[in-house]
Amino acid sequence: MIREKFERIKPHLNIGTIGHVDHGKTTLTAAITMALAVKGYTKAKNYMDIDSAPEEKARGITINTAHVEYETDVRHYAHVDCPGHADYVKNMITGAAQMDGAILVVSGADGPMPQTKEHILLAKQVGVPAIVVFLNKADQVDDDELLELVELEIQETLTTYEYPGEEIPIITGSAITALESLTAKYVLRIGNKWVQKIYDLMETVDEYIPTPKRDTEKPFLMAIENVVSITGRGTVATGRVERGMIEVGQTVELVGLKNTKEAIITGLEMFHKTLEKSVAGDNVGILLRRIQKEEIQRGMVLAKPSSILPHQHFKAQVYILKKEEGGRHTSFFAGYRPQFYVRTTDVTGHIKTFQGKIDNTQIQMVMPGDRIQMEVELIRPIAIETRMRFAIREGGKTVGAGVVTTIVQA
């Protein structure tokens, strides 16, 4: 089957829904695609299309980050529906790391919950630059004053995590009521109060979330999110291009986790359409020649040859989450071995030493809420570089978040 070409007419942005479990992220994603489909901008996706993996349907929660595409009057969006269940924050980290902006979904009936706060913190740590809030389930709240109190609480929470809480737009609506209106046969879709709230939300996203300046000048790099094998054609690696650009026919290196290996790009696709060239910000599938499926895995990066090296040993500045932020309840010591989440990989690391952030004195014990410097040795080499952000997790909790300051050469 011949695929059509991807036409680059409108600016492309990566956006996502974040927030607490059952606050309505996936329902809102479905409502957005349905509302924009009415205007002829996209194909409608229902809730079950987005909530696609079998274990998601069985438990009614989103596990893998799900990608959909849609357009507004002025932009083309790739939308990632981020998981809300505590066990699956690692996928949320992968999804958030790909976002140019986020829609924070908060139930008007419940207000901000522990995962709401954790997702805001993670969004800040992985560099999501702008957030718009959708205050959902407004149809379940009769008291306007209660919704105003929830708005204030959301603003305070955002400000706590260094987002401009008082400036961030908050759109109040009901994703499920809008979705029901959009799927009903005899309801006027345009002009419906709840559907209009979805259009208001997307107009706000268009206006408030800035079009990012893509980092196309630096050497190409893409963290691999998934790998599939196509019989007779080769191996496809999918992910978001972090920086640079790449064309069919060019050579790339596979870096991290295993021995570094070269491959030739024989095809590029985005949303089932072919590309000759892919640039920073694109969510692409890259067809690779000379690579077997077992030689490549999620967590590796594809990069311009010799532009990035695998390392195991680094120093970093780290913030250790408080108990109220979903972090540890107790202190820990040198020798602690949590998981380090970097781009799309997670690998166990041995924390060798701690130092105070300000005075550089050696510390024996670290408490929740501390800001420290630490030296880490990973059990496997991965593609890391200075100024790169990461999260630290243990037993289903985000323990800390940090940034690499120094690579320690072996």
From Swiss-Prot:
Region span, G4: 136-139
UniProt xrefs under Pfam families: GTP_EFTU (PF00009), GTP_EFTU_D2 (PF03144), GTP_EFTU_D3 (PF03143)
The UniProt record lists the keyword Magnesium: yes
Stretch list, region G3: 81-84
An example Gene Ontology biological process: mitochondrial translational elongation
Keywords annotated in UniProt: Chloroplast, Elongation factor, GTP-binding, Hydrolase, Magnesium, Metal-binding, Nucleotide-binding, Plastid, Protein biosynthesis
Domain of life (superkingdom): Eukaryota
Coiled-coil ranges (or none): none
Matches recorded under InterPro entries: EF-Tu_GTP-bd, EF-Tu_GTPase, EFTu-like_2, EFTU_2, G_TR_CS, P-loop_NTPase, Small_GTP-bd, T_Tr_GTP-bd_dom
Cellular location(s): Plastid, Chloroplast
Binding site for Mg(2+): 26
Family membership: Belongs to the TRAFAC class translation factor GTPase superfamily. Classic translation factor GTPase family. EF-Tu/EF-1A subfamily.
Name under which the protein is recorded: Elongation factor Tu, chloroplastic
Organism: Codium fragile (Dead man's fingers)
Gene: tufA
